[in-house]
Amino acid sequence: MTLLNKSIRYYVDFDQWGINAFNSNPIETTKGFNEALIYASENNFPIVEVPKGNFIIDSVNTLNQRNPEIGGGIKIPSNMELLLDPEAVFQVNPNGYQGYSCFYIGLAENVIIRGGRIIGDRYQHDYSLIDTDRKTHEWGFGIHVHGSKNVLIENVQISDCIGDNIWIAAHGMMNYPGMVYTPSKSVTVRKCELKRGRRNNLATNGCEGLLVEDCDIEEAGGDTIGPQLGIDLEGYGENGRKYDHPYELTISDCRFRKNGRGSVTAHTSGKVSIKDNYCDNVISYGYSTDVSIKGNKIINEGGSKEYGIDSVGVSSTETGNRIQITDNNIQGFKIGMMIRGKGVSIDNNTVKNASNCAIATHMAEDVSISNNRIQDSDCIQIQVRNSSDIKVSNNKGKGTTSAYAIKVMDSNDVKFLNNTFSNLYGGLYCERSQAVRIKLNDFLLSGKGYGIYWDKDSEVFLTRNEIFEPRNVAIMGAADMYNIRISDNQIYNCKAIIAIHLIGGSEHMVRGNEIMFNRDSDQGYGIYLNGTKKVRLIRNDVQGIGARVLSHPFATFNASSTTLIHNTYDSGTPRLALDDTVIDYK
């Protein structure tokens, strides 16, 4: 070591400062560490080294009865790098207070803490003392960053705190009368191991510029309090006003395992990047804005879990979410992705082994779902519910024994374009939804469901879809409420008795459809109208394969005032109503 290196490093002498390195004398030990750090700071030592030892830390600030975590434990001053030996172990002295801080970085700047191990008192804590305002004992922290900036926490092991193992907080609150808001800024947590935080493993309520990377984050929660997350980005606002707002946050290349209620939640935050992490539980964008969830492996190989990616909606302080969900691999959840809120793009993800639904929207608006792959998921592939302005395009899925590939319920302004689904029970099922456009989709059916179905309260437009081997009606609709358009669709190897069946309503257009039957027996109705009025059938073609004979390629006898123009067929005879108009249909 050079003389220059010696001159900038201060080595803590335990005897000089009355520090006990053998698990005793917590008050004297804590006092000694604080005095040593003050001495090093006042004498301009930028680096302080702590040798190995086992230290009991008095982490409670008893002078602050309301918030004993503020100013508790070892207080690190500005402009200091604290190097802890890998075998330096700091144990919180068991106590009964609502909060504590083993290490406290308050209104400081340019602070680094590296190495060492911090252990909370979770399993020795006295939870019996109940304060009228703070009843849950959830404010005990391993490292507490409070209104500080330019902070690096690296290669530290932290476990078993009664609150969060690392808590990164603002000093004060935004938009609160009489209070000055000082967020923490530019905080990095790197290569740390965080385990068994009773509330969360890491959380922030007010940080501008947070990077958490290459950390192992495990086993948060396990008690009655929440949220029990690996990382909780937990801003707060109500009635259109922000009080806490984490901002410009990146969670990257971390490994999340066995965290009680989820891996990462961006509850009410802004400009968040969650990328390239391994998780075994849910990532949620909550109410947040400008969030990117990219390249994560979200793989559940344990028990039943609800969501791979989840959400809540739009915050009262915002007009939308603006979310990007791309390139993720999601496996083993009931629902792969649950999309809520406004302004969400879901692109190029893989969802595997979903059991209830692969991708779902609920109370969502302005959503694009595109280029996703759904594998080994015997369930609804894509569901749109209580949503509007939804586009679903270029997705691919297969393999349902009792579920439709797509379900639409109580929604409007929904477009399905160029999706491919195979080996299906049924294609698309629509209820109580309007302005549903279904175009250029492929449905290869193997079950007894409909190819495309809608109820009497739905408005649909079907264009250029291909339906293969339907065993039930290929296109079926109870069209009472709206005028329906069915054009240029192709139905191949239809094994059902009816290919297109319309019930009720008036002035529908059925144009340019190609229907190919391939039944094991005679009979078959190409287009069957029941209770409709003034429907136009134009240039549709109905064909039977082999020697089987169709009954009636066009059956309008239970309808009225149908107009048939230039329709063609190769077997059977049309069965028409007396008031139909026919123009060269063969």
Swiss-Prot record:
UniProt PbH1 repeat ranges: 108-147, 148-170, 184-206, 207-235, 246-268, 288-313, 320-341, 364-384, 387-410, 411-432, 435-456, 481-504, 505-531
Record's signal peptide: none
Keyword terms of this UniProt record: Repeat
InterPro entries linked: Beta_helix, PbH1, Pectin_lyas_fold, Pectin_lyase_fold/virulence, SCF-Subunits/Alg-Epimerases
Claim: Transmembrane is one of the keywords in the record: no
One Pfam family from the record: Beta_helix
Protein name: SPbeta prophage-derived uncharacterized protein YorA
Gene name of the record: yorA
